[in-house]
Amino acid sequence: MSTVEGKKQEKRRALLDAAYELFLERGASKTSVEEITSRAKVGKGTFYLYFADKGAVTQALLARVSYQLLDDAVTACEHTAGLDSFPDKMIFVIDHIIEALRKDTLLLRFLERSFVWPGLDQIEASGEAEPLMRKLFHTILASPEMAGRTEREIYQRITSLGSMCMSVCYSSILEGKPDNIDAMKPVLYDIIRKAFG
């Protein structure tokens, strides 16, 4: 990477880091572009070189945070013995994400119900895909539970279940509705097993 490219990446990262800190402290709606650029120590014009508006930086952060949560969960899954079926692996990953969000309710408030399954709908089994997503895609396609399903059906099922889990996670952890998260986990995991059975 050239020095110029490296500096561009540093500025973009500084903007994302500043926005993330401010969003956690104050909330996205109460944070201005000026506050983000001030914290990042860059000019306001620099912000608009990288992001069209505050919504674009929010989407980039949602993708970054979701990716990190997913990467951590997948790595933990790979290092855990006894997870033989795809539903077991899916439940492990979802549980890992739920526990991370239970420990960090500020992060959960930021994500709200907007977990982003990074590029799952655009993944191809080729070497072009991002490594984490390529690995996930191969695992999903190789599982017997997915036999006979199209890539679109797999995507729809996984994102629907993931969205449902995030919504229940948010409501259960922050609001105690419809029940606390420990009471809701068996319900969620039963739905996941049935969806892939």
Q: Can you annotate each of these PLM segments?
A:
Residues 41-51:
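Short hydrophobic/aromatic patch on the recognition helix
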Residues 60, 74-103, 161:
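Hydrophobic alpha-helical connector segments
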Residues 88, 100-120, 170-174:
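Amphipathic alpha-helical segments used for helix-helix packing
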